[in-house]
Amino acid sequence: MNKTNDNDIDQLIYLFSKLPGLGSRSARRIVLYLLQDKDVRLKSLINNLVEIDKKIVKCEICGNMDTENICCICSSEYRDKSVIAVVETVAELWAMERSSNFKGLYHVLGHNLSAASRQNPSILRLPELLKRCFAENIKEVIIATNSTLEGQTTAYFITEYLREHPAKISRLASGIPIGGELDYLDEGTLSAAINLRQPFE
């Protein structure tokens, strides 16, 4: 229980505690850190969040987050536009970009499939992916879903969905442990997984 009568502070702690990787104790520490220097720390955070809320949009093509409707990756003339890496979320896209090893395009699914919960595959952006493969003459689709059970389930579903397209379908290779999530891998491991990707059937 917090030593305060201010419900707003309690609500702020609660909101921080819902962020990935944070619990109530870490959330309290963050809130205290911000409040101890409100004029600099808190106001700076507030101003930054307001600007992000105004500027950041989802890329109309791949689903990345950027300040333009077409993100800097999709609009770049230096990317290999014959290859698409299919990732579960923007977090995995950013992880692959940190590796500086992949120079193709991306397609963010937004979700994965859980065999246990029997989710509807329509939650994935697969119709958009297939449309891109035909429209952009894609030669290779790299399935870069996580090595979790949900990621594997999603990978197999993607493969079945793309069978009518002639593009080569590959999967990130060794270096990713079973149950591993791309966002937590170091750049060297992820680079090796990209370079050693395997055909996926």
Curated annotation (Swiss-Prot):
ZnF locations on chain (C4-type): 59-74
Entry-linked Pfam families: RecR_C, RecR_HhH, Toprim_4
Entries under InterPro entries matching the protein: DNA_Rcmb_RecR, Rcmb_RecR, Rcmb_RecR_Znf, TOPRIM_dom, TOPRIM_RecR
SUPFAM superfamilies membership: Recombination protein RecR
One MF annotation (Gene Ontology) recorded for this entry: zinc ion binding
Domain of life: Bacteria
Coiled-coil regions, chain positions: none
Keyword Nucleus found: no
Record domain Toprim: where: 82-177
Record key words, sorted: DNA damage, DNA recombination, DNA repair, Metal-binding, Zinc, Zinc-finger
GO biological process terms held by the UniProt record: DNA recombination; DNA repair
Family: Belongs to the RecR family.
Biological function: May play a role in DNA repair. It seems to be involved in an RecBC-independent recombinational process of DNA repair. It may act with RecF and RecO.
NCBIfam families, alphabetized: recR (TIGR00615)
Protein name: Recombination protein RecR
UniProt lineage: Bacteria, Pseudomonadati, Pseudomonadota, Alphaproteobacteria, Rickettsiales
